Swiss-Prot record:
It is found in: Cytoplasm. This is Ribonuclease HII. NCBIfam families: PRK00015.1-1 (NF000594), PRK00015.1-3 (NF000595), PRK00015.1-4 (NF000596). It catalyses: Endonucleolytic cleavage to 5'-phosphomonoester. Keywords: Cytoplasm, Endonuclease, Hydrolase, Manganese, Metal-binding, Nuclease. The lineage of its organism: Bacteria, Pseudomonadati, Pseudomonadota, Betaproteobacteria, Burkholderiales.
Amino acid sequence: MLHTPSIKQASLLWDVAGLVAGVDEAGRGPLAGPVVAAAVILDDLQPIKGLADSKILSARRREQLFDEIRAKALCCCIAQASVEEIERLNILQATLLAMRRAVEGLRLKPALVLVDGNRLPVLTMRAEAIVKGDALVAAISAASILAKVHRDRWCAEVDVQYPQYGFARHKGYGTVQHLAALTKHGACPQHRKTFGPVAEVLREALP
């Protein structure tokens, strides 16, 4: 009897040498929390409709696509660099570190990695940087969604621990409300103390 593989099984029969991964990050600009990166290898046999730059999608749509990407992609990995690593390395190097971790965490090794932006992490395979890649390459769009949703969920969790800052609302960005909370309450352990607005609050708090 001839065994016909399922779509998922058939996908895994592809030549690994032809696999392409998309990589993007979330959380470079905020004043608090880790920077998150995701790497995704999509399955051409299971297309995902509606992939786009995560920034133009509603939160509800991102959540829907997050689950679909996780279910349909050949493989994906979400990684991060901590606040401590951001402080030690700087935000650019920490972002590249998170990207490298995401690629290295993929179950399948891609032949080519397409990265959103104009800088590349150090990788063992060929890689290309694509400016505005999250709007141009489906795999990068998928990575941007995974990274964004993962970080937004982190913000919701830390908001419970530090409700006075409103992380669930502003996602750590330097909004008027966030800066006011920083001035009133000072910085919490999740704040990036080398970032200008946070450093300024800490300086003003010195006796």
